[in-house]
Amino acid sequence: MSDHNTKVALLILDGLGYGKDDNSNAVKAAQTPFLDQLLATYPHAKLNASGEAVGLPEGQMGNSEVGHMNLGAGRVVFQELGRINKAARELVFEQDPTIQSAFQYAQANHKKVHFMGLLSDGGVHAHINHLMALCDAAKTAGLTSEQVFIHAFLDGRDTDPNGGISYVNALNEHLQQSTGTIASAIGRYYAMDRDNRWERVQEAYNLLTQGIGIPSEDLLASIKESYSQGVTDEFVKPIVMVDAKGKPKATIQEGDVVICFNFRTDRGREITIALTQQEFPEYQMKPLSLHYVTMTAYDETFKNVQVIFQKENLTQTLGQTLAEHNKTQVRIAETEKYPHVTFFFSGGREEEFEGERRILIPSPKVATYDLQPEMSAHGITDAICKDMVAHQPDFICLNFANPDMVGHTGVFNAVVQAVQTVDGCTQKVVETGLENGYSFIILADHGNSEYMINPDGSINTAHTTNLVPCILIDKRFSHIKDGKLGDVAPTVLQLLGLPKPEEMTGDALAY
């Protein structure tokens, strides 16, 4: 069945799932003549992109990191969330050598311990249960609430935009029988930037190291005050907890222990760089000498950062398999999703494979993407159309970020525009590709834009557990089976006429 001249393009419409036919669905509200035509003309299927099908706990929504990892690996990749949940449940933190040596260092040197990360049960970047387990481990190790401090990054993106209060309440309740004192809070917009907006990171750095923020003796009251001004969790300005004399309860000082409990790597990197790796004189940020620990390996090049859970290396991913068969490949995305089509799609590998090229189109510099819902989709489209004609790479992995990134803003009309932009851009890419001998697999990595409004009328900014579409354009195959994201790489190899490595346990879906 193989035709060795076949070339395959995988188009990932990020965050575009199957939703209900109602007014919560921005995909349905959008004019998508091209996608409608594809669904009417070509074989298509539904893929599972959440929960155990992608290596997450049952019922856990998918996300881009997990999605691209499964897409590229061709198997179910068991995710950090599942591993760390198990460790937290089984009290592994109380014996973990990295955590215990950090606690022992703090005790021996009379230093503070700071737990820092996203206060949320979204399970995308972090989980409040992991923080609670760390607090319990600190208590078991003999540390007190005068030694252990928590710097909470508020979510509102993978969770309800006004959910921060309930997480602070849950944490406070837990701390009554555990160890730890909340020292500060700030929206993830500042503390968890991933787009080199160092002026945002600076707000978090100044809060953490100097206690610069809105002074507060009552965190819940301060967050409620923020809500009353229309500022939701994600964007909450720095809040510093102070004592009766107005002095910050704790800031990160030279020699302290910092444990960053976010397990997803991409949004933990910049604050870690500022605190430990690199000076930014123009933002008055310089690294401190810290005993710094991260839940997972944020970056292999970081110096003097200890890691609790090392990455399990994935071999024989799609990228590696293509390279071993001397195939050329292109990975293309805008800044927001560039790590996903490169690092995550390659199973956690930073460097290119032999025959791989990468095209990065900068994301627009706007405060939030509802202000520019087309993002950089047109730039991606122009670049890949030129590349298909000029270089004819054997495989293309392309990501359109719009339905996800604009979906996270919760601005319904902007999401509609985002989806319409992607429909038009997909048309140009497919038409150019068909003229140049490409087959296509068009799918999403998880849902988001198809569910924008909750039953109570409130805005939903988070991902979903919905199934995602998978459209096959290849004249040799008239059918495609339902499956999971981990079945996509074997299907790409099937279209290319290449054997599937035994590490890829997913199934080829075309027939």
Task: Tell me the role of every PLM-derived stretch.
Residues 1-511:
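Feature captures the catalytic ectodomains and active-site-proximal regions of enzymes
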